[in-house]
Amino acid sequence: MNKPLIFAVFIVVIAVFFLVLNFNNLKTVMNPVQISVNDSSVPPILIKVALLGDLHLDEGKKVFDKFAMLIKEIKSHNPDLILLVGDYVTKPSKIKDITQHRKNVINAFKLFDPIPRAVVLGNHDNWTDGDAWQAEFKNLDVDLLENKSQIMNVAGRQICIRGFGDNWSHKFKYIDYPDECKDMPKLTITHDPQGAFELGVEGLVFAGHTHCGQVSFPIIGPLKVPSKAPRQAICGLYKDSKRTLFVTSGVGYSLLPLRIGTKSNWDLIDLSF
C-alpha cells in the first residue's frame, strides 16, 4: 500500500470519527448534578431542579415537535422547579417571522405546566427585540424575571428566585433580594455567567450562554468563550468564598451544528439547602 493511499485512509478514518463524535455530542441528554448550599438561616430542604438553556430554536413544526418531546422527557423526571436561562432562538438573520416565532417559543414553555418555572432572557433574545419578548411574555401570562425577584411555591416551600438581565447584551442591573426573602432558600438565574461576578452578587447562581465552549480540547480547553467570567467558571460547577455558580452546557449550538469536547444537555439538579 503506497503512502498517499495510507494517508487518505487515515484522513477518512479521522473524519468519520469526528462525525460520529459530533453526532453523539449533539444528541441532548440529561446531566445529573448534586449541589449543596450551606445557609444556616434556612430550614433544610431538598428540591429537584431542571435547568435548561441555549435552546437556539429554529422555526418550523419539526423543531417544536422535537422540543415538545424534550419537555415531556424533562417532566417525566418530576422536577419541582424549571429554570430557563436564555437564548431561546437561533441566529436572528435566520428567522423569517420573529413575531410568530417568539409566540411559539413562549407557548411551548407553557407545556411545563403545572411545574413552577423561572425565566430570563439571553443575548439572542435581546438581539431579536428584548422589549418585545418582555411584552409577549406578559401577554401570554408567563412570568419573566428580568432584573427582578419573585417568591415561588416549590415543593410546598417558599423559594425566593432572583433573575438578572444578560450581562453580554448589557441588560444586567443589580437588584438585592427583598427583605421578605431573608429566611427563605434563595437562588439567582441569569444568562451570561459574568453576572455572578458583578458587584454585590453572592450566593447560588445558575447560568448558561457559554455552551461550555462548544468546541473544547483536552489541556487547552475551549477555543473561545463569549464571556468575561473567569475561565474556571464557564462550565459546570464553580465555588468560591462568595458564590456557588453552575453553568449549563445548553441544548443548542451557535454558528455551526458542531460540538467537540462538550455535550448538548439539560441538567437535573438535586439541590439541598
Annotated model-derived regions:
Residues M1-I14:
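N-terminal Sec-pathway targeting helices
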Residues A135, N139-V142, K148, V154-T190, ...:
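Binuclear metal-dependent hydrolase catalytic cores centered on His/Asp/Glu-rich metal-binding motifs
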